[in-house]
Amino acid sequence: MKLVLFGSSLVSAYWNGAATYYRGICKAMFERGHQIVFVEPDLYERQQHRDLVQDPPYAQVRVCQGWDELSVELDRAEGADLVAKCSGVGGWDQELAEAVLDLQSLDTRVAFWDVDAPQTLAAAFAEPPDTPRTFRQLIPRYDMILLYGGGPPVQSAYEIGRAHV
């Protein structure tokens, strides 16, 4: 299975507490025979503070300089088995949240991978419920929501629509 993940950073934990979590999941998926592509924007000086000097063997890392390069990676993700937009990328979050949904097809599942549910849900519930194109309106369109904790309260909060949590 080919997985394309749009996240904050796999190679730098600088201002990025999710890096080690991403590494563990990506490595485990790779060891099970899956191909991993991790797309990350060059933000917050993360590339200058990499703690993985070399890209890891378990993922292709693609660092993007701005939205134009992220758009190219979105095009390249077409046809992947799973495309996931991770929470807290740090730039172009709303644009990515919308754009990955355009890749959804019978062959491509699209997920939202929430690595900071309290923050994500607080922001979503602060949005007007009927305003189009907000993250809150996008939630039901994802095939699934991936979480690493929170239990029933977080699951029920995400049941805004029909996404599988």
How should each PLM-predicted stretch be described?
Residues 16-23:
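Short amphipathic alpha-helical segment that frequently serves as the phosphate-/nucleotide-binding helix
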Residues 1-15:
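Nucleotide-activated donor-dependent transferases that construct or modify glycoconjugates
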Residues 163-165:
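Conserved small/polar residues in nucleotide/adenosyl-binding loops
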